[in-house]
């Protein structure tokens, strides 16, 4: 209806300013019905009626965002309809899509595009997201500093991560200098690394040491830093990325999974503690983006509390996301089998333990949980080796996988930081980075089916 009223307007009676607003409304209407190409065409018309430089630049960024969100088949099947402006946009997004896995070629393709379309609005106001790619330099490491707790209370954590890092390094000739953060203060380690000419640092792992870097970013100026943890104080710092096995990542993955599974009114049951608050908040932030509303976050002290969360809830409350131990999850499943048998249960990796028995899984039919994709590879020689060296302890195996992925990430540091949408397939998940260079992990989902754990589609 709104579009019909727009089309009925006599554009000859509108000023350029009014026309720009007209086409912006038209673009938003097309975007709402998921018609990306029509939205882009409307924004091209909008640009023709804009004089303010900032509004033109914002419009370019919005147009680029639309194209980036589009299915590649839609882009590839679109016609420029004889429009140089539309043709330029389509050529630009195709150059991006075709070269996303080869950032050096992508940089060259963008330069070529600017030469081919010198008068295009996107050449004048190059999309902000692509600016850093014009002068992209592939990651090229001379040596690496690895910062881990290798003695004291954190020794088992540090040595397990180091084992994964070293195995991923394999025969690489890049020298690695190891620093023990249990015996040397982080600021001294950074000074020693700089004195040794180290330009890339993996670590630290402990949160207080990550906070020390955040509090004094000038100390690591000129270095690429991949921390192995994130904290509440995490902020965007040039050449610093944050990576870790955060339960918040799992919560975001759960929100995505439940939304894709058609669940629209989930109950999110979190333990009544700091972990529960952080994870519940992470789920809610992602749910707001997906659904436009807050998720129903509830906090429990005892597993039995969860049955009360379903009293008076909408009939379509078909899903529960819960962070719990294996024993707590078994209790929750038992209660819901009696009171709400149709509720689909989604859980975090906290419930997935090596100590879970066949008898345990026999009671957990239908439960889905997120964990690292490495656990899909149980028949591989690498998995068998790691299971042997860690005693099959899942938490240590996750840390090993994290160490392996730390090697992968530091060797693709520039790509991760500078290439929008760049992803890496790691042992801990599909890895990508947001605008703050927080490394996101898209988890693998598993389901208990007839007593067996099988990987399912995300």
Indicate where each model-derived feature is located:
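Alpha-helical protein-protein interaction scaffolds
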Residues: 1-129
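Short beta-strand segments enriched in small/hydrophobic residues
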Residues: 138-157, 267-268
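Beta-alpha junction/loop-to-helix N-cap segments that form part of ligand/metal-binding clefts
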Residues: 156-161, 174-233
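An alpha-beta-alpha
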Residues: 165, 243-298
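Periplasmic-binding protein-like
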Residues: 194-207, 225-228, 265-270, 316-329, ...
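Short beta-strand elements at the ligand-binding edges of bilobed clamshell
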Residues: 233-257, 361-373
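Extracellular/periplasmic periplasmic-binding protein-like sensory domains
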Residues: 333-404, 414
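Segments of small-molecule ligand-sensing domains
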Residues: 391-457
């Amino acid at each position: 209806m709104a579009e019909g009223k727009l089309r009925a307007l006599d554009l000859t009676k509108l000023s350029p300013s009014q026309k720009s607003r007209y086409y912006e409304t038209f673009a938003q209407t097309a975007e709402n019905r998921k018609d990306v190409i029509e939205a882009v065409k409307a924004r091209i018309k909008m640009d023709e009626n804009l004089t303010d430089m900032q509004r033109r630049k914002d419009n370019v960024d919005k147009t680029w965002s639309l194209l980036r969100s589009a299915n590649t088949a839609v882009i590839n099947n679109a016609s420029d309809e004889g429009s140089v402006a539309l043709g330029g946009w389509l050529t630009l997004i195709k150059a991006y899509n075709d070269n996303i896995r080869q950032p050096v070629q992508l940089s060259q393709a963008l330069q070529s595009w600017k030469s081919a379309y010198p008068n295009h609005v996107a050449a004048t106001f190059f999309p902000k997201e692509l600016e850093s790619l014009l002068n992209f330099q592939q990651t090229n490491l001379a040596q690496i500093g690895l910062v881990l707790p290798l003695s004291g209370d954190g020794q088992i954590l540090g040595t397990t991560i180091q084992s994964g890092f070293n195995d991923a390094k394999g025969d690489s000739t890049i020298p690695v200098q190891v620093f023990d953060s249990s015996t040397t203060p982080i600021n001294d380690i950074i000074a020693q690394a700089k004195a040794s000419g180290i330009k890339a640092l993996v670590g630290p792992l402990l949160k207080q040491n990550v906070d020390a870097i955040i509090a004094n970013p000038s100390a690591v100026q000129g270095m690429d830093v991949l921390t192995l943890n994130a904290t509440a104080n995490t902020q965007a710092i040039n050449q610093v990325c944050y990576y870790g096995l955060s339960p918040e990542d799992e919560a975001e993955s759960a929100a995505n999974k439940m939304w894709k599974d058609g669940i629209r009114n989930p109950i999110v049951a979190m333990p009544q503690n700091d972990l529960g608050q952080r994870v519940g908040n992470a789920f809610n932030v992602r749910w707001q983006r997906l659904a436009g509303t807050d998720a129903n976050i509830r906090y429990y002290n005892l597993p039995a509390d969860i049955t009360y969360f379903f009293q008076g809830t909408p009939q379509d409350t078909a899903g529960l996301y819960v962070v719990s131990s294996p024993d707590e999850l078994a209790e929750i499943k038992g209660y819901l089998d009696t009171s709400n048998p149709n509720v689909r249960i989604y859980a975090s990796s906290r419930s997935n333990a090596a100590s879970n028995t066949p008898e345990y899984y026999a009671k957990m039919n239908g439960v889905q949980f997120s964990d690292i994709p490495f656990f899909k590879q149980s028949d591989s020689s690498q998995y068998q080796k790691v299971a042997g060296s860690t005693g099959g302890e899942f938490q240590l195996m996750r840390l090993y996988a994290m160490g392996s992925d730390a090697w992968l990430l530091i060797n693709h540091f520039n790509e991760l930081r500078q290439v929008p949408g760049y992803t890496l397939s790691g042992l801990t998940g599909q890895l990508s980075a947001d605008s703050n260079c927080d490394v996101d992990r898209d988890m693998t989902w598993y389901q208990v089916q007839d007593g067996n754990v099988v990987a399912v589609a995300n």
